Amino acid sequence: MKKALALILALALSLSLFGCSPAEAPEDSPNAGGDGTQAAVGAFVGNESDEYYMVSFLSGIDYWKHCFEGMEDAGNALGVTTKYTGQTDSDVAGQVAVLEQVIAQSPKGIAVTCVNSTALADTINAAKEQGISVVCFDSDSPTSDRSSYLSTGNSEAGRIAAEYLVPLCGGEGKIAVLYTVGAENSESRVQGFEAWCAENAPGIEIVKVNDAGDTTAATDNMSAALQANDDLVGLFCMDGIAGTAGPTAVAESGKDLRVLAFDVDTTVLDKVKNGEIDATVAQGMYNMGFWSMMFLYTEANGLSAKALPQNVDTGVTIVTKENVDEYYPK
């Protein structure tokens, strides 16, 4: 029932955002009359033979399952067919090959998350030249001709994380941030976290710790930070690796810290559920998939009087013991 209501609201929002052209029905059309809403709604009834693909790298991980759930729900409600495929690792050439295979199927639209920001541009452009609608989600190809990019606003996510964690820590003291130094998404989260603290909690001192993109290195580096900073009161683990390594280092140290993770890997969700960490930040994975499908359908069927939004922030949610069960993959 919630998802049905969500779709109705999404449809209403789509109509208002895009000014769907089917509302301009001829006067003698059976759908004419009123404000044209009936005609516009009818345009959002698709054909089961129309196929829309989601393409990822590291296929099969929980993160993409949440994304595809959103796309699948939107596709089912619209009456079209949705399919998921992807490269099993982070090999760039491999994802290009998978995307080329999907294009060969001549789908109506493709939602793709890009393992590399530039390497898929030519392939995406080739799809567009064939009349296939393409949007990017989670990881962009900004130099390509993709129609829209749906992702987490990482700076805002960092601010939301600080707003949750800092009060748990009493509003002052040292908080460690464990993240991949140099990674654009993590750096933006740090920036947002720091900005919120500077504005709202000047008594917070931030200790930066590099997880180096490796679980072992992250655990070792966090352990060293705990030894060097005996007065740490909190820890924000800003990516999936940090979410595993950070709590491990804290547990091994025997110290009592308030801990906030990022993302909803099953391991992290289990830590929230058993009380090992306070909470985690869930990206809007379902929203990425849901709105990717809505955008693709809108463009592929010529329903928009306006260009799709170039960038869409799909939001984040704080996941605690109270709502953690909702985030396990189905």
For the regions a language model picked out, list residue spans one by one.
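Bacterial N-terminal signal peptides
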Residues: 8-16
